[in-house]
């Protein structure tokens, strides 16, 4: 196994150790966003580096997000797309100009986000989804996406 693949697998293993609101043994108020707010602050507020199209609803969000992303890309904008869940590869969740984020970029960004998240003790709860969202926002900022 090559070193980049090993690092990728190590990052995936660490990500899986972060709990989810749904499976946590401790009840939490999921409306409180202190954990993700602190993490984004410590990352330099990557969510402020690009314009966001937020898609909500029951069905068709992934397809709608992909279509909007492609249309913006055709117009010459650097576009990112963050969707959930993934089917096979976690990198399906984060696309840059219509392509899955590379393992190298994913590992670099995830390593930084996880390092900061690990440094918190006795602070608000962070979930698997919070961590992945922060990774996506950081990737989009680092890769100079204009629309996400």
What are these regions (language model features)?
Residues 61-65, 88-91:
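Short active-site-adjacent helix-start/loop capping segments
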Residues 26-33, 38-48, 74-148:
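ATP-dependent carboxylate-amine ligase catalytic core
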Residues 51-55, 63-83:
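A conserved segment at the C-terminal end of the G1
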Residues 1-51:
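Positively charged, low-complexity intrinsically disordered leader regions
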